[in-house]
């Protein structure tokens, strides 16, 4: 989304059940199709687990038992431990290069882990993709395409072969598309493999969240504005993408929450930020229901030991909800 920094914010969301929207301490579950009953327990509730953050984003669960997420305006990455404790995992000093000092959003955004468990970061303020090494230093994986600076990398996902896919809208630039520091004439979806950066998609105006299907045959990418779309692309054997098709169009849907982060579960259901909260889609693109929150949602991530808890970051808070199906996570 438009904010990418580090902050300690976790939203515990427990799932709500029953045919009618059921309200919990953090929100409610809107059930639109009986298929949702196989995903969300009947009496699950959305739980708010932490609050007081400044636009938390990019959550990722670390296997040793904690959640990391960016607090974009504060330029920090926060660490939340079940039980409620929040600490700073990576402070502003990691994001205070000259570029970030004049950025519209100075810190990190999307976060993920590679096969070695190293944190990989969309450092949107510094317009680059970095990796946090075991000794604490940051390695720049990429900051340019054909010699031109990225706009402001937003979200990212690893494929099982180790290649990294990411989106690059202009939200981190002070004037976004009209910013004089913008070097690329488009907002792209890119792939990093073997140290090489490849442009995959350039016809989306503001690509944002992205996630693979369980078999990695498809890559889902949403477009935040002005057209609010969830797109699906066939992944070719060489890792590039075929032509995109519209998976779901939000054109006629009211609400200020544009598509942002997304995740997929092991059965192929998609959980995508959208108007009112987290929209849940079947693999065929049927809208099964919505996790409705009073705050604007930015992203989500699978957590806990069994991978069945969906953590949600929103305007100032962290939520979670316990589901029946485990998610795909790094």
Residue ranges: model-predicted function:
Residues 4-15:
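Bacterial N-terminal signal peptides
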Residues 18-330:
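Sequence-structural signature of mature extracellular/luminal beta-sheet repeat domains
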């Amino acid at each position: 989304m438009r904010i990418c920094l580090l902050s300690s914010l976790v939203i515990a969301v427990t799932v709500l059940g029953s045919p009618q929207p059921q309200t919990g301490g953090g929100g409610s579950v809107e059930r639109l199709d009986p298929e949702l009953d196989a995903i969300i327990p009947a009496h699950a509730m959305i739980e708010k687990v932490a609050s007081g953050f400044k636009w938390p984003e990019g959550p990722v669960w670390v296997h040793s038992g904690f959640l990391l997420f960016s607090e974009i305006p504060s330029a920090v990455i926060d660490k939340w431990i079940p039980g409620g404790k929040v600490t700073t995992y990576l402070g502003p000093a990691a994001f205070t290069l000259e570029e970030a000092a004049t950025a519209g959003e100075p810190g990190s955004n999307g976060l993920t882990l590679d096969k070695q468990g190293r944190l990989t970061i969309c450092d949107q303020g510094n317009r680059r993709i970095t990796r946090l090494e075991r000794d604490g230093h940051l390695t720049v994986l990429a900051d340019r395409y054909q010699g031109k600076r990225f706009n402001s990398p937003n979200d990212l996902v690893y494929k099982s072969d180790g290649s990294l896919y990411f989106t690059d809208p202009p939200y981190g630039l002070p004037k976004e598309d009209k910013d004089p520091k913008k070097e690329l004439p488009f907002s792209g979806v890119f792939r990093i493999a073997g140290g090489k950066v490849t442009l995959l998609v350039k016809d989306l105006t503001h690509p944002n969240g992205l996630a693979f299907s369980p078999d990695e045959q498809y890559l889902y990418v949403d477009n935040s504005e002005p057209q609010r779309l969830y797109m699906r692309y066939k992944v070719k054997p060489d890792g590039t993408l075929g032509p995109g098709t519209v998976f779901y169009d939000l054109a006629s849907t009211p609400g200020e929450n544009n598509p942002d982060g997304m995740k997929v579960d092991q059965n192929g259901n998609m959980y995508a930020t959208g108007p009112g909260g987290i929209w849940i889609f079947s693999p065929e693109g049927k809208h099964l229901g919505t996790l409705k929150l009073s705050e604007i949602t930015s992203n989500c991530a699978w957590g806990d030991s069994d991978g069945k808890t969906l953590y949600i970051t929103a305007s100032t808070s962290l939520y979670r909800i316990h589901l029946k199906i485990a998610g795909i996570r790094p």
